[in-house]
Every structure is written in C-alpha cells, then in structure tokens.
Regions:
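Acidic/polar loop-and-plug regions of large Gram-negative outer-membrane beta-barrel proteins
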Residues: 1-45, 72-84
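Face-selective signature of the C-terminal outer-membrane beta-barrel domain
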Residues: 38-72, 77-191, 217-219, 229, ...
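Membrane-embedded beta-barrel scaffold of Gram-negative outer-membrane proteins
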Residues: 51, 57-63, 219, 225-231, ...
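Outer-membrane beta-barrel channels and translocator barrels
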Residues: 53-55, 103-107, 166-170, 178, ...
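Transmembrane beta-strands of outer-membrane beta-barrel pores
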Residues: 64-68, 104, 115-119, 177-183, ...
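Gram-negative outer-membrane beta-barrel transporters
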Residues: 167, 274-276, 296-387, 469
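C-terminal beta-signal and adjacent terminal beta-strands/loops
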Residues: 234, 276-278, 320, 328-330, ...
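C-terminal beta-barrel architecture of Gram-negative outer-membrane proteins
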Residues: 351-411, 427, 432-436, 440
Length: 472
C-alpha cells in the first residue's frame, strides 16, 4: 500500500486504498483478492565467545540469511491493457564478524572486523494480461519482463581504544576502513518498463572509506561529566540509488559536545551537534515504479541542533522520561530545475527534517504488578520537497498512546505472564506522518511547464491492541 492518496482524497476519504483496485465492465469498483506481499527469511547463526587470562576476550560469528518472496499487483493499464504481475526477490546474505578485546585498569581496546556478501536476483513476471483490450498482445503466462541481479561485497576492519589518563579524564579513538564492491546486471526490458532509469545497464563500482573518530570525556565530579567528539563518516549509495540515477558517496563530518548530570533519582543528558555534509543523499519525495523512495545527492548541507534526554523519578509510583530535539537542517545554495529553468533556491530546509521533535512518557505504577504509561509524541512541520514548495509542507502533529501492563502468574502454567493493552492514538487525531512530492513537465508553446503533486499516508485513528506474553 505504498501508493498513498492525494490531497483531495485525504479530505474526502482518508481510508481509501487504490492498491489492487480495478473496474468491471459496468464500471463497478472491485479489488484484486491476491494483492499481497509474500516474503520469507531463514536465519542461521553460529557464535563463539571466549575468555582468556589478562583481561582478553574474543568473539567470532558466522551468519547466513536466505530470503525470497514477491509482491503481486493488479495494474490498471488505462490506455494499455490491464495486467497482473509479480516482482520477485531471491537473495542470499552471509558472512562473518570477529573482535578481540583487552580490558585493563588503564584502557579498553578492541580490534575487529567483518566480511559480508549479498547476492540477489530481481525479476518480474506477468501472470495475466487483458488480451481482449489488445489482441496484438503477445505476452504469455509467467513471461519475465525483467531479469536482473545484484551483488554487494563489504569488508571492514577497525581498531578502537578508550584510554583513562586519570580518574577524571579519558580519551578514545576509533579507526575504521571499509571496502564495498557493487556488481549488478540490468536487462534491457528493465529500462523499457521503467524499472530503472534510462541509460543504466550495468553496475561495477568500488568504494573505499577511512572513517576516524576521536573524543574525550571529563568527569567534573561524581554527578557531572562533559564530553566532546569528532567523527568522519562516509556512506555508499544503495543499489536502488544507482537504479534511479548516478549517485556519489555521502560524506559527513560530525562534531558533538555534551553534558550529563546524574543524581540519585534523575539523570539529564544534553548533546549539541553540528553535522556537515558533502553530497548528502536526500529523499526527493518521489518513488520509483517499485515503490522505493528516490534519493539524490545535493551539494553542501548541514544539521545543527541540540538534544535533551531526561529521566526523573518523581515518586515511588511515578516516573517521567522526556527527550527532545531542536535543530536547523539546511541545504546550502540549492539549485533545481523548474519550468525548464535552473533556479537558485538559496538555503532551504532539508526535506523530511522537522526542526522540533519531542517525546514524553509518564509511567504510573500503583503497585508492583501494574504499569500504566501515557506516551506523547510531537513532530513539527516539515517539507517533502528540497525546494520547500508550499504544497509540500506537512503540518505538525501531536499524538498520544496509552499502555497498560499487568504482571501475573498462573499456577502450573507460568510464573511470568504479562497481560497488555495498548491504545494507539488515544484522542483519535486525524493526522499524517509521512508523504511525498513529485513534479512532471509538459511542453507548451515553446516552453516547459512544471506541475507539482503530493501524496500522503494518513495514520490510523484510535485503535486497540491486546496481548498476552508467557514465559516458560
């Protein structure tokens, strides 16, 4: 159900879902009964942890995941025949991880790494095409209209240390090297059907990243400490990013400064951050034909803000947990094409980046067996479009959930049973938490006119979940 709904439908019928909808010969609206997602994974893991003399420990793990499945979709052809298709994934993911650690009174050091390989087939097949609407249609049952593959090999190794200079000051360092190799083959029909962007037929790309981190911690006293850290992080594009364009790696310099207060019945942590990006991969608001969100590189951008996290015990029965974030998230000197003209939009807000987020949990325990929690979440307004187009603004929302847990036991069955009731959206707010923005160009009178549109994912109104957990 990744289609979403437009603004008019949001006002008139927010529960409408067009996935699988089609019309019979009399024009009646029907829904395809097998409009489904069917995906499975099998996980296998082997872990070996060993302790040695001198504070040494080692960890080694092997893993393998086999995933396969499809989504089946009824497609209304409008000017072409209706058809039903399946789009498949069949993939293997396996590798190993390791680490060796030594902890002493002066330092805590670790050397480790991992190797992982993902190998996947991606293909689509037709299950049915409305031959009556186009007698020249030659597709047959389960004929593949694209047949692609994608491989990703990743290796990383790191060394890190926490070193205690004295009882007040400690420093840490973390050096990581990552190597990523992509291989992908794209069939010609993938481009024809819109599965990937035109011009993309094969991917053979290698990335190598060196990511250093360092920081220091200073204990002012038993209750207060401060810290500073710097991290260099680099992230490769995904296969989907390549299928929708020619992206570059994202690079980030992250500076953070924090203070933590710990008292007998409360704790407060304040963290300031300044994140400087080069070629940040950001959401455009659009989705490709398979429903994946499309990302693009932008030039220079940043995120500057402050976070607060607190936990306060008000009494033996009442506890308050709060976290909030205030930030400025900006594109710098942002350019985009509109009406066929390259325009400078200046400094714009990064899409999908609200400037204020707050969460609050009030826990009340009348006795040792019952916990009642009121959870509140506020998210300020944000944009779907990097251009900050007015129609792409998503309004703020404020929602509350009520959670009830009763601990009990049943003799002869279990001594640890939790009866749970969760009331989501307690006050029945009609809100939207996510959506998208798109544009399309229409040539008119020797010029290009750009049209805009939005789609939304309205969230559920008040709903109740009841559960029972047993431990044997």
């Amino acid at each position: 159900a990744w289609y979403g709904i437009d603004s008019a439908t949001l006002e008139s019928n927010r529960k409408y879902n067009m996935a699988g909808e089609f019309y019979d010969e009399e024009g009646n609206s029907l829904y395809y009964k097998d409009q489904i997602d069917n995906y499975k994974q099998d996980h296998y893991q082997l872990h070996w942890n060993q302790n040695y003399l001198g504070g040494w420990t080692s960890n080694f793990g092997l893993h393998y995941t086999y995933g396969r499945g499809f989504y089946e979709n009824y497609n209304v052809g409008y000017d072409s025949p209706d058809y039903i298709d399946r789009r498949w994934l069949d993939n293997d993911f396996y590798g190993f991880i390791f680490s060796v650690n030594q902890r002493t009174t002066k330092y805590n050091s670790t050397i480790g790494g991992s190797y992982n390989k993902y190998s996947g087939e991606h293909y689509g097949e037709y299950l049915w095409i409305d031959q009556d609407s186009n007698s020249e249609n030659s597709y047959s049952f389960k004929e593949k209209f694209y047949d692609d593959y994608g491989n990703k090999n990743e290796f990383n190794i790191y060394a890190k240390i926490d070193y205690y200079l004295n009882d007040k000051l400690s420093i840490y360092g973390d050096l990581q090297y990552r190597n990523i190799k992509y291989e992908a083959g794209i069939s010609a029909n993938s481009v024809f059907t819109g599965y990937v962007e035109e011009g993309f037929s094969r991917l053979d790309k290698t990335f190598s990243f060196f990511n250093p981190k360092f920081g220091l911690f200073y204990n002012l006293n038993d209750s207060n400490n401060i810290y500073f850290s710097y991290a260099r992080a680099q992230r490769e594009p995904t296969r989907t990013d390549f299928a929708n364009g020619s992206p570059d790696a994202e690079k980030l310099n992250d500076f953070e400064l924090g203070w933590k207060l710990t008292l007998e019945n409360s704790s407060i942590n304040v963290n300031a951050f300044y994140m400087i990006y080069d070629n940040q991969l950001v959401l455009t608001g659009q989705r490709d034909i398979n429903g994946y969100e499309i990302r693009r590189n932008i030039g220079e951008s940043y995120r500057l803000g402050i976070e607060l996290d607190s936990n306060i015990t008000l009494s033996s029965k009442l506890n308050l947990n709060t976290n909030l974030s205030i930030s400025s998230n900006k594109n710098q000197d942002f350019y985009s094409i509109f009406d066929g003209i390259l325009k400078n939009y200046g400094n714009t807000d990064l899409a999908y980046s609200p400037s204020f987020i707050a969460n609050n949990i009030i826990d009340y325990s009348p006795n040792e067996k019952v916990i009642i929690s009121l959870r509140s979440n506020y998210v300020s307004e944000q944009y779907f479009a990097q251009t900050n187009s007015p129609i792409s603004k998503l309004e703020s929302f404020f929602v509350h959930d009520l959670n009830f847990i009763h601990k009990m036991s049943i003799k002869g069955l279990s001594d640890d049973i939790n009866f749970k009731v969760l009331v989501n959206n307690l006050f029945n707010s009609k809100y939207v938490s996510y959506g998208g923005y798109y544009t399309y160009d229409v040539p008119t009178d020797n010029q290009i006119k750009t049209y805009e549109g939005t789609y939304y994912y309205p969230q559920a109104e008040i709903n109740i979940l009841v559960g029972l957990d047993f431990k044997f």
